[in-house]
A protein has these predicted regions:
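Polar/acidic, low-complexity leader/linker segments enriched in S/T/G and N/D
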Residues: 1-51
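A structural detector for beta-sheet-dominated domains
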Residues: 14-16, 48-55, 63, 78-80, ...
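Short, flexible beta-strand-to-coil junctions
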Residues: 16-20, 51-54, 117-124
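Short, surface-exposed beta-strand/loop "edge" segments at domain boundaries and coil↔beta transitions
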Residues: 17-26, 53-60, 93-98
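Intrinsically disordered, low-complexity coil segments
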Residues: 55-64, 105-110
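Residue microenvironments linked to proteolytic maturation
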Residues: 73-143
């Protein structure tokens, strides 16, 4: 008898033009939100674990993409003014870690990083929604 896959928790990330990285102080604009929305709805995106200690153990450089460690997938995306809301399914054993959203570069961005806010603990329905945008980076050829 095949074993069942682990239940997935879901969380919603809000990407806003007023979001500020508490470390770098980087802001982004409404066009970035629109580009991200177009990308996610057309191609989807995945979330990767960026735990530095795990990366070091696996010998992955900090600036190197960790392609084989996708841990979640986008379920839906909708835009409300300058706020992009993206819902992801994520294994419930992974909550509370630093996450990064990656997508194909067609939409004009490479990476969006989310950081846990508060405890990031799933509720009784398995939902984790205590994540917020940390920063977004753009492809250099779009300058």
């Amino acid at each position: 008898m095949a074993s069942k896959k682990k239940e997935l928790a879901r969380f919603t990330a809000e990407i806003m033009d007023s979001a500020v990285d508490t470390i770098g102080g980087i802001r982004f604009t409404e066009p970035a939100v629109l580009a991200a929305y177009a990308q996610i709805t057309a191609h989807g995106c995945t979330v990767e674990d960026l735990a530095v200690s795990d990366r070091a153990k696996k010998g992955v450089r900090p600036d190197e993409p960790w392609k084989g460690h996708a841990m979640a997938n986008s379920i839906s995306a909708n835009i409300e003014g300058t706020i992009l809301k993206v819902e992801f399914s994520v294994p419930d054993t992974r909550y509370g870690k630093i996450l990064m959203v990656t997508a194909d570069t067609v939409g004009g961005f490479d990476k969006i990083r989310f950081i846990p806010v508060g405890q990031g603990v799933p509720d009784k329905d398995g939902k984790v929604d205590a994540f917020k945008l940390s920063y977004v980076t753009f492809r250099s050829d779009l300058k």
